[in-house]
Amino acid sequence: MAKRKANHVIPGMNAAKAQGMGAGYNEEFSNEPLTEAQRQNNKKRKKNQ
């Protein structure tokens, strides 16, 4: 399955942040990326593991 280009990246943000995330995940978070502890407790990510 070919990787699709993330279409939810806002110009001016770091485009590399979108890689490896499902589309739409970033809209719920503030601009700074999650810390490692938050990532472990993130329910959306936990569902994918």
From Swiss-Prot:
Protein name: Small, acid-soluble spore protein O
A Pfam family: SspO
HAMAP family assigned: SspO
Predominant subcellular localization, coarse grouping: other
Keywords: Sporulation
Annotated organism of origin: Geobacillus kaustophilus (strain HTA426)
Subcellular location: Spore core
Triggers of expression: Expressed only in the forespore compartment of sporulating cells.
Positions of region (Disordered): 24-49
Gene Ontology biological-process entries: asexual sporulation; sporulation resulting in formation of a cellular spore
Protein family (similarity comment): Belongs to the SspO family.
GO cellular-component term (any): endospore-forming forespore
Signal peptide extent: none
